[in-house]
């Protein structure tokens, strides 16, 4: 168990040392083929034995995910310097003060939860994207 509601099985596609630093960029592929990225320390990468082909569980706090409408013609992306974007369809919207919690159904059927300003106009059934920093993606070994 964990308090992180966003949990997605992924496969490592690349592990790249970040120049002049203790960080490692890890490229991941989701079950629906979308790309994710994670930044971890070299020590963490070694402890997990991260290598292409390894199955991992990618986790991310809902509070780290900014949800907004999907812009026509954009695709899912994952770049360590600029961030990650997962695309899905709004499954649920829970209003709150100033922000609303939004659950996205990804093409794989998994849910990805984040927050959006009330002004985004997100409604159930509408295409939307969740954006978050690679540093917010935690990995665990899949069992």
Predicted regions and their residues:
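Glycine/charge-rich catalytic "coupling/switch" loops of P-loop NTPases
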Residues: 1-9, 14-16, 34-35, 39-98, ...
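Short aromatic-glycine-enriched beta-strand elements
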Residues: 19-27, 95-103
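Short solvent-exposed strand/turn elements
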Residues: 26-36, 104-112
